Amino acid sequence: MTDKRPPARNARSGYRRTLPWRVVTGVSEFLDRRIGWDKLPVPLGLGTLLGLRVKLRQENLHDTNRIPAVNVPEPAPGNGRSYLVNRTADGSYNDLDQPRMGMAGTRFGRNIPLEQIPPVSAADVLSSPNPRVVSRELLTREEFIPAETVNSLVAAWLQFMVRDWFSHGTSPAERPWTVPLRDDDPWPERPMQIMRTPDDPTRDPQEAPAGTPDTRVNVSSHWWDASQVYGSSEEEQRALRTGENGKLRLWGDDGTPFPSDPDRDPSRVPGFWLGLAMMQTLFAKEHNAICDHLHTQYPGWDDEELFQRARLVNAALLAKIHTVEWTPAVISHPTTVTALRTNWWGLAGERAHNLFGRISNSEVISGIPGAETDHYSVPYTLTEEFVAVYRMHPLVRDDWHLRAAADDSTLREATLRDLAGPEVLKVMDTIPMHDLLYSFGTLHPGLVTLHNFPKFLQEFERPDGHLQDLAATDILRSRELGVPRYNEFRRLLRLKPAASFEELTDNRDWAEQIKRVYGGDIEKVDLTVGLYAEKLPAGFAFSDTAFRIFILMASRRLNSDRFFTEYYTPEVYSKAGLRWIDENTMGTVLLRHHPDLRAALAGVKNAFSPWNVAGRE
C-alpha cells in the first residue's frame, strides 16, 4: 500500500501561541539562559520547565511521514472491535482516527526540523574523527566511576524499557561500514566492520523529494505498551501465553527456560544479559499476579479478558514506575523530582489523587493519566534523537560481586561477560533470583560520563560470533542516522553551544583530550561525547542536554496514548486494575515475588536507591 497523505501540521500551527503563553515561554528561556532552571528555587524552576516544555512542543516535533511511503504496515485488529478497549499486539489502533500511528514497522520521527538534516556521506560517518579513535581515547573505562546515589537496577531497568520502546531491527550483513584502524590498535580484525542500520522498507525513492533526510522504522511499537513482555505481534503474543486464566508462560514452566526454537531464544539476541532477564521474569510474574487478583474480583472473566486487562494494568504500572521512581532516582534534583511526580499526579499530588481522583482536566493540576489525548498537532512516534540520548551504556558495570541477601556472603565474583548471552541461564540456574536482585540493589551502576564505557562492551562478541565495539558503534550510529553533532544539537534546541573545549567541560584534562581527538574543531564533537563531557546538574546521572529531549518526550509518551489519557478509566482498566496501579511501586512488586528482600528494602523509599546491606548497621 502507498501512503501519500498530505503533510501533517507542524507543532507551530497554534499550540499555546497566545500572548500570555508567549510571555511564559519567553521568560522561561530567558531565565534558563541567564541563570539555569536547576539554580532557581523549586517553584520558579518548575514554571521554567513548564515554559521550556511548551516551546519544545511547538518547535521540536517533526513528522517523517510527510515523506511519501510504500508498503506501509497494515493494522490488523484481531477479535472484532476489541481494539477499542484493548491494546493490540502491534500497537495499531491506539489512535482510532489514524490506526497506523505508532504501530510496529512505522517510522521514527525527529526532534529537529527535517530541512536541518543534511544528507549523510561515508566521510560524515567514518571520519572527523574515526569512531574507533573516539572510543579508545575518550570512552574507554580505565577505572570504574560509580553513580553513588542509585543502584544497578537502574541499568537493568533502562534496557528493559528500551526493549519496549525502540529497535531499528536486525542489521544486514551486506555493505558493512569499514572503519580503518591505527597500527597500534589491538582489534583482532582488519578493518573493523560495523553493520549498517537497516534501510527503511517503506521508503519510496521515486516519490521522496530530493534532499529529504533518510528515514528508518521502529520494528517495535512506539507506544509504552510493555511489548518487551508481551511481544509486538499476534504470533509472538500467542507463543508467550498459557491460554489459561490470562497468564504468561514463565521460564522453566515446562522444564526448559526458553523456547526450543533457536530463532525465539532471547539469550541469542544481542544485548541479552542478566539484568534484562531479571526484569523480564519479574514483570511476567507481575502480570500473572494481576491476573490472579482480577480473577478473584471478576470470576466471570475468561482467559482473553483477564490477559488483556492485566496487560493494560502491567503496562501502566511500568510507566508509573519509570515516571515517578526510576527517573527521579537518576535525576534527583528537587525540581525534577517534583516535575516528574506532577506528570503523573499533577500539582495536586498523590494524596489528593488517592482521596478525590482527578480534580481538574488540566494535566498540570491533576497529571496526565486520565487527561485528554493530545499529539500537539504532530502524529505520535518516538524519535531518532530520543534514541540517541538514551545511549547510556556507561551505566553498566564490568565487575559484579554476587552475594546472598541473608548475610551478604559471596556467592560468585563475575564479569559482565559471565552475565551475558547464554551464560545468563547458568547463573539463573545456580543462584536464587532474590540473591541476584539483592546484588544489583546493593551495587552502584556507572556514571554516564567519559572514560566509563564498559570494557566488555568495547570488545563485545555477539551471539553470531561477530565482534563489536559498542562505544564506536554508538558514535557511528548517531552520525549514520543524521543526528546532529553536539553544538548543532544544542542550537536546534535553542541552547547555547560550547564556544570552546574548556566551556564544554569543567575537566581540564578532558578538554585537552577532546580537543586533540577532534583536531581543535569544537563543531565536530559528537553528540555522545558532548553529553558525557558536560557538567551535570545537581543530582543528575546524565546530562542536562539529554534532559531537554526527556522534558519533551517523557510526557509525550503519556499524552499521546489514549490508554494513558481518555481511556484511563475504570470501564477500560476495571476499578481493581486502577487500584493496583495506584497502590503499587517497584518496591511492592519486588516484595510480592521475593519476600526474602524485606530486610534489604526496609526503609528504602525508592527501590532504585541503594539498598540495605545485610549485617551492616
Regions found by a protein language model. Give the residues of each.
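Short linear, low-complexity motifs centered on an aromatic residue
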Residues: 500-517
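Alpha-helix capping/termination and helix-coil
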Residues: 493-497, 518
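Metallocofactor- and cofactor-centric catalytic cores in central/energy metabolism, strongly enriched
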Residues: 296-298
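N-terminal accessory/cap region of cofactor-dependent oxidoreductases and related radical enzymes
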Residues: 1-289, 293, 309-472, 476, ...
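Mobile, glycine-rich extracellular loop/lid and propeptide segments
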Residues: 303-306
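Folded extracytoplasmic luminal domains of secretory or organellar precursors
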Residues: 480, 495, 503-504
